[in-house]
């Protein structure tokens, strides 16, 4: 338990129906008693049981300045594992800020970013992977991304890691006994069982690592470059995906001269769209700079939507664009399917994961594109309720664990001694413990919680 009692606004800033000020620490009830007066004089804050609520008034220096509700949680049955009081006042910056100031004057300290969840972690209410999931859940834009975060918060990843640790720990106990006490009558380790355990653990880690990229897309979204020749329909596509007229659309070639940005939700995926200048040869210095930025965005993007004018034959610029998309996560959209087709899609097909005929003015094409993007990025194959990795810290630890297990398997196949296998299994266990947060350094813990906002 922490010695200080902390206070902060737990809800988003700005106008709203309510705002919540959260207290956590041994003096939470004492602080609440100084700033909250129950409407029923027979009710006492100090005597309030956990999981109960009282209606009353908030006071500052003896002056009532708002009315609201106090929710009480007794340690250890609270989010942080400490005594917690949540004070719900009317929304709006002035009232909530005054309530926090009253709490500070009554003896509380300002909460640091992520301090509530950090206390939950330090008090054993959450593991480190679950604490990381809290921020993922707060940041989630799509239903699947939120489901992935909720699964991690519920302990899906922690349980999966625990199962692999248990399997390797049992194996290591036998290996250690065999290596350290060769003169004792220790049963010989069954090599088939050894191979089976190592293979199963590696398969599990391979699955987590393999799904990491698609899981990350669901959690964080992806940068998407819309590229193509002038008047191919790029800005029309941006407007279709955005659901409103974000970009100017005219018949004049070169209307878009700079990169136009817009975040959109396409199914369960957040796309950070970049509508780029039309690709062509030009002597206009401003347009040329826009085209240079277009190529740069294409190189940087995690997803490319290349738009081609289906009403015209392919040009040299079209073929150059196709070649630059080779080996990239790119979808070719042959636009204007409502007009007679003159575009030979077979010329560009080898360079793209898929080629789709679309009409960027029709809502039906939005659904077609959404399904194609989900297939290309692999998000349609993700079980949102399964264990998943989140963030570079977890991925790096999983990769180290996988490398150590693979090394143990190679050592067995090479016929080296069990002591060499034991070293590899030890390394794998260390990496899994780091993944679970069991041996995380203070620097790692700081890195996790610095992502959080004040009040969480």
Predicted features along the sequence, with ranges:
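A glycine-rich (often HGG/GG-containing) alpha/beta subdomain
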Residues: 1-147, 151, 155, 331
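C-terminal-of-GTPase-core extension/linker across diverse P-loop GTPases
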Residues: 2-9, 13, 143-265, 282-284, ...
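Switch I (G2) and immediately adjacent beta-strands of P-loop GTPase domains
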Residues: 55-65, 70-74, 254-282, 300
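Short glycine-/small-residue-rich Rossmann-like dinucleotide-binding loops
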Residues: 242, 277-278, 302, 309, ...
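Short, Asp-centered acidic motifs that coordinate Mg2+ and/or phosphate
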Residues: 271, 303, 331
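Generic enzyme active-site microenvironment
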Residues: 273, 307, 333
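Inter-motif core of Ras-like GTPase G domains
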Residues: 287-311
């Amino acid at each position: 338990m922490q010695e200080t009692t902390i206070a902060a606004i737990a809800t988003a800033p700005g106008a709203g129906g309510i705002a919540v000020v959260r207290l956590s620490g041994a003096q939470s009830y004492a602080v609440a008693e100084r700033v909250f007066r129950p409407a029923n004089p027979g009710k006492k804050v100090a005597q309030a049981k956990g999981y109960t609520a009282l209606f009353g008034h908030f006071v500052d220096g003896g002056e009532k300045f708002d009315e609201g509700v106090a929710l009480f949680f007794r340690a250890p049955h609270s989010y942080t594992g400490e005594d917690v009081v949540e004070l719900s006042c009317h929304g709006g910056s002035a009232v909530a800020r005054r309530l926090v100031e009253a709490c500070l004057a009554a003896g509380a300290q300002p909460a640091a970013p992520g301090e509530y969840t950090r206390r939950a972690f330090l008090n054993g209410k959450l593991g480190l992977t679950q604490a990381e999931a809290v921020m993922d859940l707060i940041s989630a834009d799509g239903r699947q991304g939120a489901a992935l975060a909720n699964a991690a918060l519920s302990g899906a990843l922690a349980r999966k890691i625990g199962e692999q640790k248990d399997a390797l720990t049992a194996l290591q106990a036998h290996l250690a006994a065999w290596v350290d006490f060769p003169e004792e009558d220790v049963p010989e380790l069954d090599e088939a069982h050894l191979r089976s355990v190592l293979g199963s653990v590696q398969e599990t880690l391979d699955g987590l690592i393999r799904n990491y990229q698609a899981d990350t897309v669901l959690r964080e979204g992806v940068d998407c470059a819309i590229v193509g020749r002038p008047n191919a329909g790029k800005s029309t596509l941006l407007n279709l995906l955005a659901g409103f007229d974000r970009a100017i659309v005219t018949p004049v070639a070169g209307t878009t001269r700079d990169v136009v940005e817009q975040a959109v939700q396409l199914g369960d995926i957040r796309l950070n769209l970049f509508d780029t200048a039309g690709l062509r040869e030009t002597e206009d210095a401003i347009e040329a700079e826009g085209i240079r930025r277009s190529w740069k965005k294409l190189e940087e993007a995690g997803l490319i939507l290349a738009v081609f004018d289906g009403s015209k034959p392919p040009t040299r610029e079209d073929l150059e664009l196709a070649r630059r998309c080779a080996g990239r996560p790119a979808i070719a959209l042959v636009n204007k399917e409502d007009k007679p087709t003159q575009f030979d899609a077979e010329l560009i097909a080898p360079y793209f994961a898929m080629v789709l005929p679309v009409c960027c003015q029709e809502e039906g094409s939005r659904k077609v594109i959404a399904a194609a993007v989900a297939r290309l990025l692999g998000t349609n194959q993700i079980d949102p309720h399964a264990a998943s990795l989140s963030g570079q810290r977890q991925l790096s630890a999983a990769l180290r664990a996988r490398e150590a297990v693979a090394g143990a398997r190679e050592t067995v196949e090479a016929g080296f001694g069990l002591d060499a296998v034991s070293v590899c299994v030890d390394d794998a266990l260390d990496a899994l413990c780091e993944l679970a947060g069991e041996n995380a350094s203070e620097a790692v813990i700081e890195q996790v919680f610095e992502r959080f906002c004040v009040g969480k």
